[in-house]
Design a protein with these regions (language model features):
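N-terminal, active-site-proximal structural segment of metallo-dependent hydrolase catalytic domains
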Residues: 1-73, 77-82
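Active-site beta-strand/loop signature of hydrolases that rely on acidic residues for catalysis
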Residues: 1, 18-44, 88, 121-123, ...
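Conserved beta strand-loop-helix elements of the APE1-like EEP
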Residues: 52-56, 80-96, 124, 204-205, ...
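Active-site-proximal beta-strand/loop segments in catalytic clefts of secreted hydrolases
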Residues: 1, 33-35, 63-66, 89-91, ...
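Surface-exposed cleft-lining segments at the edges of enzyme active sites
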Residues: 3-8, 35-37, 101-111, 137-146
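Metal-dependent phosphoesterases centered on the DNase I-like endonuclease/exonuclease/phosphatase
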Residues: 143-243
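Extracellular/periplasmic catalytic domains that process cell-envelope and extracellular macromolecules
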Residues: 23-24, 53, 78-81, 112-115, ...
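Beta-strand-turn-beta hairpins that frame and shape the catalytic cleft
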Residues: 81-95, 112-137
């Protein structure tokens, strides 16, 4: 009955648990997606600011991929959205750039839809003229397929261009697709009515890259029913990973 999945208090509780978990893991690099800055759905809580404040030892970069004053659907509507992807690093970052990805949607739908992008961060490697290139991504989900293909190709081209320079690359995030080398037999498609991710043929990235996911746990689940007493009834997916 509502697009608001949590109360304001619950969002703050969730953010506290998220930042506590990130601090306990103490990773060198963190790649986050769907971080709201000022969105009605999260009660306009600045999640990016909370993450920065609670992880003070990290430098950070943030890029919008969803920014609109009004999403007019469904009923009641989603409303205002200001959301993006966020990269945090314990290593000094020399540059961080937002790279625009191809948008498969036309006017007027594109006005209130996501504008997918990458954050490309570069870390100088001491004693060399090389860099570690970190790519944070969140690729298309609900298009007919052309957008995913175009965005995946652009990602592959960027990774290849950086390795051609002699740099090292790590790309990670939400591909909204499943790598062809991932065993998803534990998560069969339950219904043709539910969203199904397409496959990324990892051979498209060539032999110089390794595509990795951990399929021992799903990284996504459907939102077609209430969470209560339904843990074993959802459609599960493995759509997040690293290159």
């Amino acid at each position: 009955d509502s697009v608001y999945t949590s109360t304001k208090e619950q969002v703050l509780t969730n953010m506290s648990a998220i930042t506590e978990e990130l601090n306990s893991l103490s990773p060198d690099i963190i790649l986050l997606q769907e971080v709201d800055e000022k969105s009605s759905r999260s009660h306009k809580i600045n999640e990016a600011s909370i993450i920065k404040d609670e992880l003070p030892s990290y430098n950070s970069s943030y890029a919008y991929n969803y920014k609109t004053l009004m999403v007019p659907y469904p009923i009641p509507p989603i409303g205002q959205v200001a959301s993006g992807i966020m990269t945090l690093s314990t290593y000094p970052v020399s540059t961080a750039c937002r790279i625009k990805l191809p948008c498969p949607f036309s006017y007027p739908i594109r006005l209130c839809n996501l504008k997918r992008c990458l954050i490309v961060s570069k870390v100088p490697i001491d004693g060399t003229n090389k860099e570690l290139v970190i790519v944070n991504l969140h690729l298309e989900a609900y298009d007919s397929g052309e957008g995913k293909a175009a965005q995946t190709k652009m990602l592959a081209d960027i990774l290849q261009a950086e390795t051609d320079k002699g740099n090292y690359v790590i790309a990670g995030g939400d591909f909204n697709q499943t790598f062809s080398n991932t065993d998803i037999s534990a998560y069969p498609q339950q219904s043709d009515e539910l969203w199904a991710p397409s496959l990324i043929d990892i051979s498209e990235f060539g032999n110089n890259f390794t595509c990795i996911t951990d399929s021992s746990d799903p990284t996504c689940r459907s939102l077609d029913k209430s969470y209560d007493d339904a843990d074993d009834k959802f459609q599960f997916y493995v759509i997040d990973g690293f290159i």
